[in-house]
Regions:
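Acidic, mature catalytic/reactive cores of soluble proteins
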Residues: 1-175
Length: 175
């Protein structure tokens, strides 16, 4: 791809979500390796932090005041940054806005018990960087079976996105 003819750049909901999913996939591998070699707990912590920071960036208005999540519509959109014109959300409901649903995984309680250094860093990050875990799935409230959910979207966002995804006038085919 080349530069935009008018300059500027696009913040991509789908591309950013794929990177969040990549971090979760790498986290899963690092946790598996850490079960055999505790040195990988540091690597796992780094991938978890990267995932959390990506999720934060997608859900919150940064220094430039831009968020990929549109609170009014209840959907993720790409955002076009145009010189001298500011930021323009590209309000087209497409698969681009559903890809954030792909970046999801769980942490099992048994795993956290086996990897105390990872759990300590996870708990420290949640306690000392609370803004980063805001507006994504709740990491500090254990769910069914004491699992912890890692997801870009929290329950409210999930329900709002599913309204579009399961609507025959939007995404769901009648066939």
């Amino acid at each position: 791809s080349g530069p935009l003819p008018t300059g500027g750049h696009i913040e991509q909901s789908d591309g950013t979500s794929w990177m969040a999913m990549y971090c979760l996939n790498m986290l899963a591998m690092a946790l598996e390796l850490a079960s055999e070699d505790s040195a990988y707990e540091d690597v796992a912590s780094k991938f978890w932090e990267h995932f959390t920071q990506i999720a934060y960036a997608m859900n919150n208005r940064g220094d430039d005041g831009v968020s990929l999540w549109n609170e009014e519509d209840g959907f993720f959109y790409d955002v076009l940054h145009v010189p001298n014109q500011g930021e323009i959300p590209m309000k087209t409901r497409s698969m681009v806005g559903l890809i954030p649903l792909y970046a999801v995984d769980t942490l099992e309680p048994e795993l956290l018990k086996r990897l105390p250094n990872f759990k300590r860093r996870l708990d420290w990050f949640i306690a000392n960087r609370p803004g980063y875990t805001r507006n994504q799935a709740c990491m500090f409230t254990p769910g069914m079976g004491e699992r912890r959910l890692m997801s870009i979207v929290d329950g409210d966002k999930l329900r709002r996105m599913l309204r579009y995804m399961l609507d025959e006038n939007e995404f769901l085919s009648p066939f």
